[in-house]
Curated annotation (Swiss-Prot):
InterPro entries, sorted: UPF0473 (IPR009711)
NCBIfam families named in the record: PRK13678.1-4, PRK13678.2-4
A UniProt-annotated Pfam family: DUF1292
Domain of life: Bacteria
The family this protein is said to belong to: Belongs to the UPF0473 family.
Protein name stated in the entry: UPF0473 protein GTNG_2486
Length: 98
């Protein structure tokens, strides 16, 4: 994972690079990890309804000029916490649109 200001380059298991935009990051004291919500920048990332799939990973930030590392979400408890954070984010976005 490479960091830009608001972009990261994600490399999949096949070695393909994909530019993604960071939606937001947060830290969890309960799990002692940082997390990032991100989505692909390319138009091909949209589904047939025009929706863009958002991904989430734990991450270890890199030092100033070093790459960081994306990590998988490991437990059901982490997924529950992430879902709660996502739902709060979506509710706040909807309130801002009104």
């Amino acid at each position: 994972m490479e960091h830009g200001d608001r972009h990261i380059t994600v490399v999949d298991e096949q070695g393909n690079e994909q530019l993604c935009e960071i939606l937001f990051t947060f830290e969890s004291d309960d799990f002692g990890k940082s997390y990032v919500f991100y989505y692909p920048v390319s138009a091909e990332a949209e589904d047939e309804d025009g929706e863009t799939e958002v991904h989430v990973s734990a991450f270890i930030p890199g030092d100033e000029n070093e790459e960081g590392e994306l990590l998988p979400i490991e437990t059901e408890e982490e997924w529950d916490m992430i879902e709660e954070v996502w739902n709060t984010f979506c509710a706040e976005q909807e309130e801002g649109e009104e």
